[in-house]
């Protein structure tokens, strides 16, 4: 969480943020702070929210590859999708080389640290797995 505070303060954002664990209040607080820092006020065209499993990864990836419309970045928020337990392989492959203008914020209750998606996110979110906070 300290890294997120530092990124917000400096304006140097990572392309991927992963917030996970049981502390729902902290996850929500930091997700809100990231949304305010990453997204322009009223920019609904470049801000996307996905919750649960009711979305197509193919459509998400297509949208992620699209340049933002009249904005610096496109931001995609994912909440309790279960992608870090199963089904996230396709997204992990995309995140190995994502569009530079698309940013991702994942908020999950549980993650499988053996999953390809988790390992891919660690490459962007922190210099070492030890810095990933639960």
Please place each PLM-identified region on the residue numbering.
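Short, surface-exposed connector motifs at secondary-structure boundaries
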Residues: 44, 100-103
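Short regulatory helix/loop adjacent to the ATP-binding pocket of P-loop NTPases
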Residues: 112-123
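Single conserved hydrophobic/aromatic residue that forms the stacking wall/gate
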Residues: 124-134
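Structural recognition of the conserved hydrophobic beta-strand(s) that form the central parallel beta-sheet
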Residues: 77-79, 103-109
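P-loop/Walker A NTP-binding region and its immediately flanking N-terminal helices
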Residues: 1-83, 89
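Conserved catalytic/switch belt of AAA+ P-loop NTPases
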Residues: 90-101
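A short acidic, glycine/proline-enriched capping/turn motif at secondary-structure boundaries
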Residues: 82-85, 111-113
């Amino acid at each position: 969480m300290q890294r997120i505070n530092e990124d917000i303060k400096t304006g140097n954002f990572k392309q991927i943020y992963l917030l996970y664990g049981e502390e729902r209040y902290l996850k929500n607080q930091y997700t809100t702070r990231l949304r305010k820092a990453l997204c322009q006020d009223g920019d609904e065209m470049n801000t996307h929210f996905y919750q649960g499993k009711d979305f197509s990864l193919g459509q998400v990836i297509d949208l992620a590859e699209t340049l933002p419309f009249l904005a610096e970045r496109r931001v995609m928020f994912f909440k309790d999708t279960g992608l870090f337990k199963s089904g996230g392989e396709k997204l992990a492959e995309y995140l190995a080389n994502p569009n530079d203008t698309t940013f991702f914020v994942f908020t999950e209750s549980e993650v499988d640290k053996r999953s390809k998606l988790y390992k891919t996110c660690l490459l962007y979110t922190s210099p070492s797995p030890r810095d990933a906070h639960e």
